[in-house]
Amino acid sequence: MSNIVWHQHAIDQAARGAQKGQNPVLLWFTGLSGSGKSTLAGALERALFEHGFHTYLLDGDNVRHGLCKDLGFSIEDRDENLRRVGEVAKLMVDSGLVVLSAFISPTREERDRVRALFPQGQFVEVHVSTPLSVCESRDPKGLYAKARKGEITNFTGISSPYEVPESAELTIDTSKGDLDTQVHGLLAYLKAIDVLNPPREIAGAGI
């Protein structure tokens, strides 16, 4: 490693963001399976994309088809999964993008490890706090039913704990309110922290 040095690029993150008219950031959606992380992140990405912002959504299932296809679901593999995702997200933010990620990421240590990759204010933790009972009633993939039968081990919320964030920037319960209202709340937050620069008209809200 002593022979490996960091190569400084002529174009930096600020210049890439300025070209796109935005300040790059990572929004990290965390919560139980079925809480609505991917739905919420996808709806936010759609709203941003439709109004000219440059985004990318990293989804927990999708990365296991390529980047993390060699990993299982042991504690060690889940840690490595999020380590890789964090490094990829860092590269994407450096390219000037507004990056959204939707991962259960059940432990504070895992989430804090990713947060530590970014300067203050560039990692936004969004706790999708939908209650377990609601998530289990939705069970879009049938995973809770399998976990209850013992067919899946180490399943977050059933046989493995989920550590609630202690200092998330945002908390959203998708069982309360409608998706459009929740997305507009996220857009308003991004405007307030100067990610959306300059502000643009989004769905008549002046965001």
UniProtKB/Swiss-Prot annotation:
Keywords: ATP-binding, Kinase, Nucleotide-binding, Phosphoprotein, Transferase
Keyword Nucleotide-binding set for record: yes
Example GO molecular function: adenylylsulfate kinase activity
Annotated Pfam families: APS_kinase
SUPFAM superfamilies linked to this entry: P-loop containing nucleoside triphosphate hydrolases (SSF52540)
CDD domains the record matches: APSK (cd02027)
Pathway: Sulfur metabolism; hydrogen sulfide biosynthesis; sulfite from sulfate: step 2/3
Residues involved in ATP binding: 31-38
EC primary class: transferase
GO biological process, one term: sulfate assimilation
Domain of life: Bacteria
Annotated catalysed reactions: adenosine 5'-phosphosulfate + ATP = 3'-phosphoadenylyl sulfate + ADP + H(+)
The keyword Oxidoreductase belongs to this UniProt entry's keyword annotation: no
Enzyme nomenclature, EC number: 2.7.1.25
Record: active site: 105 (phosphoserine intermediate)
Function: Catalyzes the synthesis of activated sulfate.
Record-stated family: Belongs to the APS kinase family.
Protein name: Adenylyl-sulfate kinase
